[in-house]
Amino acid sequence: MSRYRGPRLRIVRRLGELPGLSRKSPRRAYPPGQHGQARRKRSEYAIRLEEKQKLRLNYGITEKQLVRYVKKARRATGSTGQALLELLEMRLDNTVFRLGMAGTIPGARQLVCHGHITVNGQVVDIPSYQCRPGDIVSVRDRDRSRKLVETNMEFPGLANVPSHLEFDKNTFTGKVNSVIDREWVALQINELLVIEYYSRKA
């Protein structure tokens, strides 16, 4: 399954707020479609599927990528759900987004793919690159890159830089100080339901 490239607000109306996908909030509180306002009792499977879709669409990853992240999280010590969120939050595209260099994760991914971002002084154009404590994430030292990020910073996606990151607006440089804490994950998600979804499919 490829990345979603359709109307973002339609997805937000169906799944709820997705801070990584869109800055917009739905004006209507019910899902899109002719029967959007109909209230039907959802099955447990439907609830788990919806949480999985929220996670995948917010971080802009494919189904195949999410399956790989779940497998990797299962091999980690501690909570599998927490490990899954850490893996997704520490991706380079998400880190660029959380530093305020882009208004959405798709916007941050574009910056990375087009070679506007460096990690520890080297251009990294792989959005899935896993940032680690101590990494220095910067805007490439050229006018075009800096102007793009300057414009993006006027309309940041989220108001606050999370506690595991720091950002110098004068030098366009961020630092990863640690792995993100669960309370700083902006997406409202029950990650255990996502793990259950894949456990039951296995």
UniProtKB/Swiss-Prot annotation:
Keywords, comma-separated and alphabetical: Ribonucleoprotein, Ribosomal protein, RNA-binding, rRNA-binding
Gene3D superfamilies in the cross-refs: Ribosomal Protein S4 Delta 41, Chain A, domain 1, RNA-binding S4 domain
UniProt GO BP: ribosomal small subunit biogenesis; translation
Gene Ontology molecular functions: rRNA binding; structural constituent of ribosome
GO cellular component: small ribosomal subunit
Region described as Disordered: spans on this chain: 21-42
SMART domains: Ribosomal_S4, S4
One Pfam family from the record: S4
Transmembrane segments: none
Record-annotated S4 RNA-binding domain positions: 90-152
Domain of life where this protein originates: Bacteria
Subunit (UniProt): Part of the 30S ribosomal subunit. Contacts protein S5. The interaction surface between S4 and S5 is involved in control of translational fidelity.
Protein family membership: Belongs to the universal ribosomal protein uS4 family.
Database matches in NCBIfam families: PRK05327.1 (NF003717), rpsD_bact (TIGR01017)
Function: One of the primary rRNA binding proteins, it binds directly to 16S rRNA where it nucleates assembly of the body of the 30S subunit. With S5 and S12 plays an important role in translational accuracy.
PANTHER family, sorted: 30S 40S RIBOSOMAL PROTEIN (PTHR11831), SMALL RIBOSOMAL SUBUNIT PROTEIN US4M (PTHR11831:SF4)
Protein name (record): Small ribosomal subunit protein uS4
Underlying gene: rpsD
